Amino acid sequence: MANVKGPHSITSTLDRATGFIKRQKRNYSVAITRSAASSFLGNLTAQYDSIYTVGLGADSVLLGTIGSIANAISTLVSTPIGWLVDRYGIKRFYVLAMGLMAAGALVYALAPSWQWIIAATILLSVAMRLTGTGCSVISSDSVRNRDRATAQNLCVSIASIASLIAPLVAAYLITLSGGLSTEGIRPLYYIRFVGYGFVLIFVVLQLREPNRGRTDEVRASASFIGDFKQLFAGQTLLRRWVVVAALTGLPMAMTSPFMQFYAYEVKGADQYLLGIMTTAAVLTRLAFGIPLGRLADRVGRKKVIYLLAPLWYAANLLLVFSTNSATLVLSASLQTFYAVSSGMTSAMTLELVPTERMGKWSGALGLFRGLVAIPAPAIGGLIWRELGPRYVFLIPLVIDLVLRLSLLTTLPETLEAEPVA
């Protein structure tokens, strides 16, 4: 009986996921497909980017500085991109994003020194900002509030399926190319370049401009600055939410440039262990992403955020105090709950303003997130050098517990709320 139950359960899950996608608008399917392809391509190199950059001559401070440059560029373009999207539509900017991703991957592939990584980082940062704003607008238009958290986590879970084998494929290709070295990693960026080219063609052919209503009114509004003043006028909740959203991204902004490098340099992980760690994170997301999304859609986003915080705190603690490969893999698995929690925050964010203001709202959030995220990687590099590598992963936990979670308790649940702006 057990042998029958397992396959039946998988089939039932697939049927529910398919039914969920079909009842959303077409663009949601396009967004899922693009996300899955981009996730696979990104996961080919995600665990090696910092190692590759250090191999080109960077140290911990330069590694952090490059991360800060990425966040600064994302912040600079965030607000104008959001404003332009609201006025002129999303498709042209989404297509531009995929072109910039391809260009960024190519610069990585051709890089003879770490300075080239700055140029690649700039291209990829602008691309990520463009796709982030685009996803917000598409999700706001294509998905109902009661499906929001499920839609966010289903999108990521499907992307996880597509990227599940990427780390192990990458490890095999690196071995064929000469091992865990700069030249062994380099071919992966060429593969990303070609892959993004195909995704670009898909987006051009399949994406439709969202129907966001009141477009003429948005275009006729006063001015760039005036539009943003109007967005926040008298909206105490939105102002407070901006702080929560900015603090949500702080731990990852500070630790992400160093996580894989720490496992490699301090804990002695090789390319296969790094690949297994990434695969473990993907499997955890597949197992828990959709159920937690459904739970958040039933009981509220805030409760699930509180539930998940201790799990990703444990991930950083296990990474720091790990003594063997098993605890490194467990750490990577638990780190997934940070991404799930961030998805809950994103779901709440989309429920605070109407669709026709979503571009400006995403742009404003990007600006304020950036003001927090810009210095975070550079500070992480200084902490690595001056205090020691482990403190890069411990200090953000204290900040998150004391500031973000405390402030979140003062905000209302958005599950059944009407947009406030």
Feature locations, PLM:
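Juxtamembrane intracellular "pre-TM" segments in multi-pass secondary transporters
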Residues: 2-28, 209-243, 421
